[in-house]
């Protein structure tokens, strides 16, 4: 039973990143509890609820293209998933990162997901400094 929960949690996080990378915001947000808490501590952002997160994702991902996640490490328990990845993308609009449009960027991104009743109830994304590549 415990192993099945862990496997389900890992699969959910994989689906979450896949939907983000492909710009399928509604699918990504569908994996959250209604009372999701989403944090980006390095940007001093804390969002509450699916709508706030969806609005943020639409704004954020509208400034990127060719988004890819490269997992360095990922592990889970019955109620947590930790993922350490490198995200690569191309900037398509000004304002989110300190690079001009057209810049290809990589950034280390570590996530801690809390899982409740088969959905993500809290997501903390710890961003390393982005660098042009």
Which stretches of residues belong to each language-model region?
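Short, low-complexity N-terminal intrinsically disordered segments enriched in polar/charged residues
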Residues: 1-34
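Short glycine/serine/threonine-biased micro-segments
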Residues: 21, 47, 123
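Short beta-edge strand/loop motif at the mouth of beta-sheet-based domains
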Residues: 35, 45-55
């Amino acid at each position: 039973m415990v192993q099945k929960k862990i496997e389900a949690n890992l699969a959910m996080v994989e689906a979450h990143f896949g939907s983000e990378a492909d710009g399928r915001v509604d699918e990504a947000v569908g994996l959250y509890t209604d009372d999701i808490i989403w944090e980006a501590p390095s940007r001093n952002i804390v969002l509450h609820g699916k709508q706030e997160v969806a609005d943020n994702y639409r704004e954020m991902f509208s400034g990127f293209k060719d988004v890819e996640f490269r997992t360095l490490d990922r592990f889970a328990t019955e109620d947590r998933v930790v993922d350490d990845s490198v995200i690569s993308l191309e900037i398509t609009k000004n304002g989110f990162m300190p690079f001009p449009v057209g810049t290809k960027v990589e950034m280390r991104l570590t996530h801690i997901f809390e899982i409740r009743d088969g959905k993500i109830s809290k997501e903390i994304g710890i961003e390393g400094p982005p660098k042009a590549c």
